[in-house]
């Protein structure tokens, strides 16, 4: 595989997916997309992977659906052994490639690390992850060490207007209407 270190390595890397196991003997790999529409992962190029702490650009040659999976063929990955070396590599792009969002919409990456405070001023903790459920996204909040309720982690639905009262990315804070006991 022709892996090349590039001067255009992502400045603000964001993970869009992950390469899975190899498929067949000609260098195809399963791909798992983290984008809202799974096929949207192919709209963002170039892709980067990180091997031994170094960014490497990879070129998508082809992709297709196979049963319930999507499989990809990367340029220079021509056999099963080469494909196996890429198993579990994260697919990364620079965040500058992502489209600008409308007011009130947020990328999950921008919410990570935000401090979450109730409308009454109680500090719930910091956002450490997001979950997608069938009906709405959910903030996963790591509670402060000395949480008065002894809670280590909270799940708060991201319901704009109902639960989420204010998001301020400048101050990295989210105000919520939420009972700290939950």
UniProtKB/Swiss-Prot annotation:
Alphabetical list of NCBIfam families matching this protein: 16S_RimM
Keyword annotations of the record: Chaperone, Cytoplasm, Ribosome biogenesis, rRNA processing
Organism: Shigella boydii serotype 18 (strain CDC 3083-94 / BS512)
Residue stretches making up the PRC barrel domain: 102-182
Biological process annotations from GO: ribosomal small subunit biogenesis; rRNA processing
Family, similarity comment: Belongs to the RimM family.
Subunit structure: Binds ribosomal protein uS19.
Presence of the UniProt keyword Amino-acid biosynthesis in the record: no
Keyword Chaperone: yes
An example molecular function term from Gene Ontology annotations: ribosome binding
Domain description: The PRC barrel domain binds ribosomal protein uS19.
InterPro entries: PRC_barrel-like_sf (IPR011033), PRC_RimM (IPR056792), RimM (IPR011961), RimM_N (IPR002676), RimM_N_sf (IPR036976), Transl_B-barrel_sf (IPR009000)
Location of the protein in the cell: Cytoplasm
Protein name: Ribosome maturation factor RimM
Lineage top rank: taxon: Bacteria
Any Pfam family hit: PRC_RimM
Protein function: An accessory protein needed during the final step in the assembly of 30S ribosomal subunit, possibly for assembly of the head region. Essential for efficient processing of 16S rRNA. May be needed both before and after RbfA during the maturation of 16S rRNA. It has affinity for free ribosomal 30S subunits but not for 70S ribosomes.
């Amino acid at each position: 595989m022709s892996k090349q270190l590039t001067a255009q390595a992502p400045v603000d890397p964001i993970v869009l997916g992950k390469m899975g196991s190899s498929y067949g003997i000609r260098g195809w790999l399963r791909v798992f997309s983290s984008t809202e529409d799974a096929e949207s992962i192919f709209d963002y190029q170039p892709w980067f992977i990180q091997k031994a702490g170094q960014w490497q650009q990879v070129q998508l040659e082809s992709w297709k659906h196979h049963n319930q999976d999507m499989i990809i063929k990367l340029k220079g990955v021509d056999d099963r052994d080469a494909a196996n070396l890429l198993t579990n590599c994260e697919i990364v792009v620079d965040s500058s490639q992502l489209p600008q969002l409308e007011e009130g919409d947020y990328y999950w990456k921008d919410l990570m690390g935000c401090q979450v405070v109730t409308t009454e001023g109680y500090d719930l903790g910091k956002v450490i992850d997001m979950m997608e459920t069938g009906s709405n996204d959910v903030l996963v909040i790591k509670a402060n060490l000395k949480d008065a309720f002894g809670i280590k982690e909270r799940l708060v639905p991201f319901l704009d207007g109902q639960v989420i009262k204010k998001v301020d990315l400048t101050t990295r804070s989210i105000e919520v209407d939420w009972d700290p006991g939950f």
